Each structure stands twice: as C-alpha cells, then as structure tokens.
Amino acid sequence: KSLGVATLIDGSQGAVHMPVDVQEIGCDFYPITGHKLCGPTGSGAIFVSAERMAEMRPFLGGGDMIKEVHRDSITYNDAPMRFEAGTPGIVQTIGFGVALNYMMKIGLKNIADYEAGLKDYADKKLTALNWLKLQGQPNEKGAIFSFTMENAGHAHDISTILDKKGVAVR
C-alpha cells in the first residue's frame, strides 16, 4: 500500500467462515461470491475503498450510470451507480440478500463451531485408519482433508467408492 499498489483480498473462501472488517484489514478490494454463502450463482458483492472508487472509471455505458450526455462528453453518475450499466441481476441480488440473512440468522460462529466439530470427528475417524495417511497439520487446516492411500488403485476408483458411501470428493 505504501507504494500505491492496490490490494485485493479474495473473500470468497473466508467470508463464510469468519466475519471480516475490511477497514481493519485495510484492503482496497474485497470480493465475495454469493454461491459460497448459500446464494444463487452469478451473485456476489465487492467492497471497494473510497480512494479506489474515486479513481475508477466505467468501462461500459448506459442506463442510470449516466447523469448527462452532451454532443462531445458524458457525465457519469456518482459511485456506485456509475458502474451499473444495464439491467442488474435482480433475482440474483434478492437471492443473495436472502442467503446473507439466512447465514446471519444462523450465525457465523455457530457455523464455524459446527464445522469444527465435523472436522474433529472426521479427523479422529480418518486417523484411526491405518491404511490411510492424512496430509497437513490437524489444527492448521479447514474442514477439507487431503490424504494418501498405499496400494489403493486409481484415484477415480477411490472417489467412486467414497461417493457411493456419501463422501463428497474432488
């Protein structure tokens, strides 16, 4: 930041797990993805600092983003409206709002606590399997598990077997 370089922190993964104070972390941009917060695909939001918002110019034109049109010039609306060219994704925006309300009603701490319980349970069960080796440090990872298996065959075969048992793999 001291060199004038814009900072973007991708909040898509973390926003569902913890509250974030964008003022405290001091970033210029903080985008979040709606579908990772139980919202519809194609929805999301982005925080843009006032400093960066003032520097940005629209790359499209039309709709309510334009305040005045003259023969030789265009005056854009104030931010954030100057970035709203065309019809917004109304259904996605409403769905995203409902999803955020749902997440807030449950509570991010409650979600994190429940996820931690699932992680601990899975860690305990998987650690007990002598033919499977977990990768990473148990206390330093989220609820995604990477593992290796000796003489297990092809990864696709393993994922098919796990899928039939109700375990989501990627």
Predicted region positions:
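Pyridoxal 5′-phosphate
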Residues: 1-170
